[in-house]
Amino acid sequence: MRVASDLRSMEIRRIGIIMNGVTGRMGTNQHLIRSIKAIRDQGGIKIGSDLTIMPDPILTGRNATKLAALAERTGIKRYTTDLDAALADPNDEVFFDASGTLQRAGFIERAVKAGKAIYCEKPTAVETSEALRLAKLCEAAGVKNGVVQDKLWLNGLRKFKMMRDQGFFGRILSVRGEFGYWVFTGEDQDQPIQRPSWNYRKEDGGGIIIDMLCHWQYVISQLFGPIQSLSCTGATHIPQRVDEQGKTYKCTTDDSCYATFALENGIICQFNSSWTVRVRRDDLLTMQVDGTHGSAIVGLRKCWVQSLGTTPRPIWNPDIEQPIDFFAGWQEVPDTTTYDNAFKIQWEEFLKHVVLDTPFPYTLREGAKGVQLAELGLQSWAERRWLDVPELE
């Protein structure tokens, strides 16, 4: 009888979510299938023994055929091409946007006017002034808001943070980040492109600097400390590519970025980001972190560490084969918990923020800091000089 009573007392709190522009790869896979659908499939977000938050999405977009196909594939019953009608429904409290960067401001403005809580992909804009304007718009309206900062919940970064918090590294000295892979140009039909063509057109909001420096801003700030200044060089190594329709087009923005960040605490971070690099490392993103008492190699899912006591003593001698196996001296940090999908974890945090007013520091204002860093990176490249990173207004 107690079990039946407990079930009757369990409140299921429905929360309607307008999911705009999720027919693309990232929106479909990470946000819809592996986040919202996964939350629904697990029975919602359980808060203690008396509350469950259950997301109820409605898919919105311009292409009714794509929306219908996605709805059928995922079992989502609600979809529409009429965004205004969706925004007018008071039963849907959250607006999520994964559309193109250049379209994001207009969608956010409409959703804020409708009183919705705002959650969106990064970058929130391509200019700092616009990103900050959107943040202030949400703040003035008093609506809860957040931006995707998924990499903070990746397994490898969480393992590193645990070791850092336990004091393993001593004083951290430097960080070397390598990100990227070879994106096929589309010129060979047996090597189809694996990134949309708009990524290589400035006029469509493309460019690896605006894309990846937004990520590095929050990764560096959260794991290592506030960024004081930066130096950045970009490049367009591949001048032309072939688009989804088989047409050759000119690349009008950067496909590679080489940036150095000086932090307020003295740590130096170097991050190379490229869609024109072939991978011979542990993962598509790796960071080497060196400290006085230990070092780490941080990947997306794994993390390896080496302590001061197990550091080998190499001697420079190019006339003989290297006697030290440098890979053998590293220890993998084991899984000590169950690691969920990074996007899903942040979705759960945001929905709890909306329903229960729990803290959620990853706001549009924080997202504007990423846009600011990217814009400063572009300026540094254009002017060929170091730039300080000022506080946002």
Across the structure, where does each feature detected by a protein language model lie?
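N-terminal Rossmann-like dinucleotide-binding module
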Residues: 4-74
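Beta-strand-loop-alpha-helix segment that lines the small-molecule cofactor/substrate pocket
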Residues: 93-94, 100-101, 105-152, 167
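C-terminal capping/lid region of NAD(P)-dependent oxidoreductase domains
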Residues: 143, 170-174, 379-393
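Predominantly a Rossmann-like dinucleotide-binding segment in NAD(P)-dependent oxidoreductases
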Residues: 151-250, 384
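Glycine-rich, aromatic-lined ligand/substrate-binding cores of catalytic
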Residues: 211, 218-230, 234-242, 247-295, ...
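C-terminal glycine/acidic-rich active-site capping loop/insertion
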Residues: 242-245, 249-250, 258, 262-263, ...
